[in-house]
Each structure stands twice: as C-alpha cells, then as structure tokens.
C-alpha cells in the first residue's frame, strides 16, 4: 500500500512539474494577482481570447459564404443576411444600421444590381451601387485593385470597398440615398435580431 501511495505521489509531482513548466514556457505566470486581474470582469483571459477568436473565425466564414455564392440578377439577400454580411465586413452599431439602410435603398440587397443609365451619370454595381462611370471608375479600380467592374457584383468585395469609401461607415456623402433621405426611411426596418 505504501508503494502505491509513493507512486501516486511521484505521478502527481511529475504532472505538476510539467504543468508549471508549460505555464512558464507559454508566458502565463500563476499567482493570485494574475488570477484576480484576469477575472475582474467575470471572464478569464482564456475565455476572452476564445470569444475573440470565435468572432474572427465567424466573420471569416461569413465572408467566404457570401463571396463564393452564385447570385441570379433578381436575387436579393434577406434582411438578416445583409445585416450579417455588413457586420462581417466590419460595420458596427449605428454604422451597421446606416450601411444596411443604404444597401436596401440602393439595390434592395441585390448583389447583381446594375444601373447603367449614363444620362443620370451612372454605371453603378452591386448592393451599394458603387458608381464606376468614367474617371471615377478608373480611379476606384486603381485604388481598390479591381481588375474588372464585374467584381463589384461580389457582395463581399462591394461591401468591403464601401466600408473603406465611408471610412468605416462614418462618411456617406457619396451616396444619393443618404442625400435624398431614402436610406433614413429604411432604418425602422433594420432587423434587430
């Protein structure tokens, strides 16, 4: 019986030594101050890292799903799909609601939407109707490294470019649906769930 106790003690000591060595190697120093600081808000550092990783992974998977889809000209994203896509691109809070309302006003959420009415100064593509007419298109192709205007039919590319053009949803001055009030009429329809 004494030999069994000694062996168990040796095993426990070995595992404890391994655990301490691993903690030291990976920069986590055990101690009361660390534990208290990490759990000050009710979440451990590890939990926060997992949530951040999960959110980042979720955004990546969302973008891949929408970018790899094939859309018909009349097909539109549902209100929730559009919200999810815009969130994955980076829009948050008020900017997310505004982006959603602009996309609904401009194209009703249709990735394949196109307005080629040059009389009104349009050659506009995708969910945000990014205008590529004349020099504007040349400049935007160069700035956003677009090989072709057709790439703007990809809702992820369209939304990412819009995110950059609006400085994260803070400057919508290039969109007529903001200027004419059409987007603000859509805000009440934003899917809150």
Each PLM stretch: what is its role?
Residues 31-35, 69, 193:
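Extracytoplasmic and endomembrane cell-envelope/extracellular-matrix remodeling and assembly machinery
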Residues 21-23, 39-109:
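Export/targeting segments at the very N-terminus of extracytoplasmic proteins
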Residues 98, 114-119, 125-193:
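Catalytic and binding regions of secreted/periplasmic enzymes and modules that target cell-wall glycans
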Residues 6, 87, 164-167:
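Surface-exposed alpha-helical segments enriched in charged/polar residues
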Residues 11, 83, 96, 168-171:
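Acidic, low-complexity intrinsically disordered regions
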Residues 4, 8-11, 58, 62-69, ...:
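Extended hydrophobic/Leu-rich segments
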């Amino acid at each position: 019986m004494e030999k069994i106790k000694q062996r168990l003690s040796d095993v426990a000591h070995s595992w404890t030594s391994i655990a301490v060595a691993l903690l030291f190697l990976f920069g986590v120093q055990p101690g009361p101050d660390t534990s208290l600081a990490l759990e000050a808000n009710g979440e451990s550092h590890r939990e926060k890292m997992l949530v951040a990783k999960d959110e980042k992974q979720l955004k990546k998977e969302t973008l891949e799903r929408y970018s790899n889809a094939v859309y018909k000209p009349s097909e539109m994203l549902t209100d929730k799909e559009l919200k999810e896509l815009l969130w994955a691109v980076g829009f948050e809070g008020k900017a997310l609601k505004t982006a959603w309302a602009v996309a609904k006003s401009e194209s009703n959420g249709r990735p394949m939407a196109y307005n080629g009415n040059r009389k009104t100064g349009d050659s506009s593509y995708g969910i945000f109707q990014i205008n590529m007419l004349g020099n504007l298109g040349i400049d935007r192709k160069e700035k956003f490294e677009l090989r072709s205007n057709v790439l703007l039919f990809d809702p992820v590319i369209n939304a990412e470019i819009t995110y950059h053009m609006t400085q994260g949803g803070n400057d919508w001055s290039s969109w007529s649906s903001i200027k004419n009030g059409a987007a603000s009429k859509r805000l009440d329809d934003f899917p809150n769930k």
